[in-house]
């Protein structure tokens, strides 16, 4: 893949859905699938799927469709899921603990190597054999260990400070669960998961049905 190619974020955000469905197809021993069949399963048009995949190369064959395993492997590589990424999690409250206990991260190549919190009652407790550390140790940990991703699960008032420390520690990817839009340098990538915004969208759709 040409890393300089200008591909819209909308296309990138659809790739994980393709990836997930292709994985399910492999589990069901499906060897090949057409763009029409794939579209019917995931709610996209066949044309949309072809356009998305053509951004990264020529994967399908006319009259044959897509080889499921080959397409899965290609998308896996495009998304960077064929590599490993070390992550630190900051905030071991309910959301943080749920994320730390999510077993599928290992399959995505994401390894949570440390967990930090400011609550003295949580420090020393283990989650999946990872001991929760004092938040004051975050800076020194980032200096001594290679970390790719910071997962922020702290309250809004603490999130920007944590983000600044992650950036100063060399992290270039932040997964943010705090209800705030972080201010970061241009070369730092942030993926926000604002739960209130997500549920508000659902409520709006329910409201329109009344």
Swiss-Prot record:
The keyword RNA-binding does not apply. GO terms for biological process: negative regulation of DNA-templated transcription; response to redox state. Signal peptide: none annotated. One of its GO terms (cellular component) is cytoplasm. NAD(+) binds at residues 91-96. It comes from the Bacteria. Residues 17-56 bind DNA. It is found in: Cytoplasm. The keyword Repressor applies. Keywords: Cytoplasm, DNA-binding, NAD, Repressor, Transcription, Transcription regulation. GO terms for molecular function: DNA binding; DNA-binding transcription factor activity. InterPro entries: CoA-bd, NAD(P)-bd_dom_sf, Rex_DNA-bd_C_dom, Tscrpt_rep_Rex, WH-like_DNA-bd_sf, WH_DNA-bd_sf. Pfam families: CoA_binding, Put_DNA-bind_N. Homodimer. HAMAP family: Rex. Modulates transcription in response to changes in cellular NADH/NAD(+) redox state. Belongs to the transcriptional regulatory Rex family. This is Redox-sensing transcriptional repressor Rex. The lineage of its organism: Bacteria, Bacillati, Bacillota, Clostridia, Eubacteriales.
């Amino acid at each position: 893949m040409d890393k300089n190619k200008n591909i819209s974020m909308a296309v990138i955000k659809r790739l994980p859905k393709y990836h997930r469905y292709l994985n399910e197809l492999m589990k069901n021993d499906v060897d090949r699938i057409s763009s029409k069949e794939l579209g019917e399963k995931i709610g996209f048009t066949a044309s949309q799927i072809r356009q998305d995949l053509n951004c990264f190369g020529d994967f399908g064959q006319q009259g044959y469709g897509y080889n499921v395993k080959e397409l899965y492997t290609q998308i896996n590589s495009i998304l960077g899921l064929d590599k490993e990424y070390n992550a630190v999690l900051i905030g071991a409250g309910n959301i943080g603990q749920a994320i730390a206990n999510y077993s599928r991260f290992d399959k995505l190549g994401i390894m949570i190597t440390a967990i930090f919190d400011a609550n003295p009652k949580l420090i020393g407790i283990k989650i999946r054999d990872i001991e929760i550390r004092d938040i004051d140790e975050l800076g020194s940990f980032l200096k001594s260990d290679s970390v790719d991703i910071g997962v922020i699960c702290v309250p809004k008032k603490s999130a920007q400070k944590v983000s600044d420390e992650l950036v100063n520690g060399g992290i270039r990817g932040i997964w943010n669960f705090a209800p705030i839009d972080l201010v970061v340098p241009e070369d730092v990538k942030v993926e926000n998961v604002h739960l209130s915004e997500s549920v508000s969208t659902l409520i709006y759709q329910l409201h329109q049905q009344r």
